[in-house]
Design a protein with these regions (language model features):
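Conserved catalytic alpha/beta core of Sir2/sirtuin-type deacylases, generalized to analogous enzyme cores
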Residues: 2-116
Length: 116
């Protein structure tokens, strides 16, 4: 993959911060961001909101996918939007509140920008 970034210090290929092994970083910054995110969710609990999921697979669905589905089902004003190259889907319970686009995320975003 030609676009993979490399560490400027040691030259090793960089990876995403995923809960797949012992390299996941859950430091002070992670907890600060987590608290801000939870505060945002509480403040917008029953308001009009779009839960936008970009490229989330089934590696750790309990982190993003399942909570988005749950929050959408509990809020009639919510819309669950998923853009994924191969795994764009939602449960039947929230189908009427969902937009699932199975396509390349970059192309979808370029198309949206071109339509403005």
């Amino acid at each position: 993959y030609k676009r993979q970034p490399y560490c400027p210090h040691c030259g090793a290929p960089m990876t995403m911060n995923l809960r797949i092994d012992g390299t996941f970083v859950q430091d002070e910054g992670w907890y600060y961001a987590s608290n801000r995110y939870n505060d945002f969710l509480k403040r917008h609990e029953n308001l009009k909101i779009v839960y936008l999921e970009l490229g989330v697979g089934n590696n750790t669905p309990v982190i993003i996918k399942y909570p988005f589905w749950d929050m959408t089902s509990k809020n009639k004003n919510a819309v669950y939007t998923c853009i994924n190259y191969q795994e764009a889907f939602c449960p039947p319970q929230i189908k009427k509140q969902s937009i699932c686009i199975q396509a390349d995320i970059g192309k979808v975003l370029r198309d949206l920008q071109a339509d403005k």
